[in-house]
From Swiss-Prot:
Name by which UniProt lists this protein: [Methyl coenzyme M reductase]-L-arginine C-5-methyltransferase
Reaction it catalyzes: L-arginyl-[methyl-coenzyme M reductase] + AH2 + 2 S-adenosyl-L-methionine = (5S)-C-methyl-L-arginyl-[methyl-coenzyme M reductase] + 5'-deoxyadenosine + L-methionine + A + S-adenosyl-L-homocysteine + 2 H(+)
Entry's cofactor comment: Binds at least 1 [4Fe-4S] cluster. This cluster is coordinated with 3 cysteines and an exchangeable S-adenosyl-L-methionine.
Gene3D superfamilies noted in UniProt: Aldolase class I
Molecular-function GO term, any one: 4 iron, 4 sulfur cluster binding
InterPro entries referenced in this protein's UniProt entry, alphabetically: Aldolase_TIM (IPR013785), MA_4551-like (IPR017672), rSAM (IPR007197)
Pathway recorded for this protein: Protein modification
Function: Radical SAM methyltransferase that is responsible for the C(5)-methylation of 'Arg-274' of the methyl-coenzyme M reductase (MCR) subunit alpha McrA. This post-translational methylation, despite being not essential in vivo, plays a role for the stability and structural integrity of MCR.
Pfam families: Radical_SAM
EC number, UniProt record: 2.1.1.379
Native organism: Methanocaldococcus jannaschii (strain ATCC 43067 / DSM 2661 / JAL-1 / JCM 10045 / NBRC 100440)
Cofactor(s), names only, from the UniProt record: [4Fe-4S] cluster
Example GO biological process: methylation
Length: 415
């Protein structure tokens, strides 16, 4: 059985512990004074908890001191065996002041290291990358944006752009490297994007995920900070999917290409079950449904779920929010309840208190049962890159079997 990775969160905050905000950062322009809670699945009796008030805004405080990180490491190892340590942070891991010392200490214990999501903005010397590899770093997740240092300086606030890219190249030559590129229309798309991915292929990167830029509340900026950049109109979901396909078709033989919110051309996600080639599997799943329910989702998942539950006793309705996990109480308030059945499934990670969701969805006098759905029905491009087509389909089958079981348990039975 594969041993799990130990996650060590070094804390820190975007904009403070990352050498300054990138222009496109999801957390830029967020007002951290007197944050108001959204409500979420972790809230107890009242609306508001650490997660939906502070964590969602990455209000974490400064980096934790090195002794605290080592103490967390040692205490975790008392109870479970791990093969690798995943270093992550609310700030940028590369900006952690004792990163080399921490990695050296982890290496002395005999564990390998994954540098979680980093932009490399804290690396001011390529020797740092070499030392980290010597200290056991064998996997890196790197936010690239572009291999053009001028674009990194302008859009990522990267004062060490050339050095950061040299470090990235060294990591690519010596580690497993997964790269991320937030794609902004007219800035780093088109030929710039192809040049960046071509460089990553030449350097030896293992995978690249293209991430659609969000610039409005319905696209996912729920923290009151939209727009991030005035005058930029993000790609539509379909335009973005076409970009992912184009990059995959040109470079997919040399590097794994995925996209979020759409899609993974190799794994066939999200919602591989909606593909015609899997219709026979879908029909078998549909035959197991004997309850009635409504599923509330977002713009991206809606056409897939609508197709999956077509001609069943389950209907799917959407709110005007691209990503279902970012649905808030405000979105639910705009729903026309005439299409909502007596059992309602909301996304498990939706930012709404359970009691508030019930009040909103019962405002027409119908005493509806409100249930949070299955944790993950499909694989997003951020995680699907390590799955084969068969593994991704198996994941979805198991997830939908769980959901159907919940529908049959909570849903009003068909007459």
């Amino acid at each position: 059985m594969k041993e799990a990775n130990l996650l060590i969160d070094l804390r820190g905050e975007p904009g403070i512990n990352c050498n300054g905000f990138c222009k496109f950062c999801y957390f830029r322009k967020v007002n951290k004074n007197n944050p108001q809670p959204f409500g979420c699945r972790y809230c107890q009796f009242t609306v508001g908890c650490d997660y939906c008030m502070y964590s969602v805004r990455e209000i974490n405080g400064d980096f934790i001191p090195l002794p605290f990180a080592l103490m967390e490491l040692q205490s975790s190892l008392l109870f479970k065996r791990y093969s690798k340590v995943n270093l992550t942070a609310g700030g940028d891991v590369s900006c952690y002041p004792q990163l080399e010392e921490l990695c050296k200490a982890i290496n002395n214990i005999g564990l390998k290291i994954h540098l979680g999501y980093t932009s490399g903005k804290g690396f001011d010397n390529v020797e740092i990358a070499k030392n980290l590899v010597d200290y056991g770093v064998d996997e890196v997740t790197f936010s690239v944006f572009s291999t053009n240092p001028k674009l990194r300086k302008e859009w990522m606030n990267d004062k060490n752009a050339e050095t950061a890219l040299k470090c990235l190249r060294y990591f690519c030559e010596n580690c497993e490297v997964h790269c991320a590129i937030i794609v902004i229309p007219g800035v780093n798309d088109g030929e710039e994007l192809k040049k960046t991915v071509s460089d990553l292929v030449d350097w030896g990167a293992n995978a690249v995920i293209l991430m659609r830029f969000a610039n409005s509340e319905e696209q996912g900026l729920i923290l009151g900070n939209a727009p991030l950049i005035e005058g930029i109109k993000p790609h539509s979901v379909e335009e973005f999917k076409n970009i992912v396909d184009e990059i995959h078709n040109e470079f997919g033989d040399y590097i794994r290409v995925t996209g979020t919110p759409l899609h993974d051309p190799v794994a066939g996600t999200p919602f591989a079950l909606a593909k015609e080639e899997n219709s026979h599997i879908l029909e078998r799943l549909k035959d197991k449904i004997n309850g009635e329910a409504t599923i509330i989702t977002g713009n991206v998942a809606y056409p897939f779920l609508k197709k999956i539950f077509d001609e069943t006793s389950v209907n799917v309705v959407k709110v005007n929010k691209d990503i279902a996990d970012l649905i808030t109480a405000k979105d639910l308030e705009k729903l026309d309840l005439k299409d909502v059945k007596e059992t309602v499934f909301i996304p498990p990670k939706a930012f709404v208190h359970d009691r508030v969701a019930e009040e909103i969805l019962r405002r027409d006098g119908v005493d509806r049962i409100v249930v949070r759905g299955v944790e993950q029905l499909t694989l997003d491009g951020e995680v699907s890159g390590i799955y084969t087509r068969e593994e991704a389909l198996k994941f979805e089958i198991e997830a939908f079997e769980e959901l159907i079981g919940m529908i049959n348990f909570f849903g009003m039975k068909k007459q």
